[in-house]
């Protein structure tokens, strides 16, 4: 196993471990939010703790997804052009989602 493959494997394992409590937290939070009024939801979603967890979850989740998809493309896509286009599509998707979430957090913070 090369050095970069080992680093990728280690990051995949640690990010998946980090996502377990984050996903659990957000599943519980969604159930709690479903029973709240609109004003209570806005209050909860505006808390710094919640916004930080949203950013952490988004960043770790997107990096984990990106690495996983890169591994799948590396293993199953053999055409050079298709591989480059797939990598570009993944990177654009990740950048777009991260941009939307970051902008949402900023707008919630300044509100």
What is the predicted function of each stretch?
Residues 1-111:
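Membrane-embedded alpha-helical bundles that constitute the cytochrome b-like, heme-associated redox core
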């Amino acid at each position: 196993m090369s050095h970069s493959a080992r680093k990728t494997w280690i990051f995949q394992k640690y990010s998946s471990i980090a996502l377990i409590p984050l996903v659990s937290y957000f599943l519980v939070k969604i159930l709690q939010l479903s029973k709240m009024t609109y004003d209570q939801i806005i209050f909860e979603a505006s808390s710094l703790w919640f916004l930080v967890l949203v950013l952490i979850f988004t960043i770790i989740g997107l990096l984990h997804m990106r690495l996983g998809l890169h591994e799948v493309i590396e293993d199953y896509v053999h055409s050079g052009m298709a591989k480059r286009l797939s990598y570009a599509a993944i990177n654009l998707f990740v950048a777009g989602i991260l941009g939307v979430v970051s902008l949402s957090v900023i707008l919630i913070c300044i509100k």
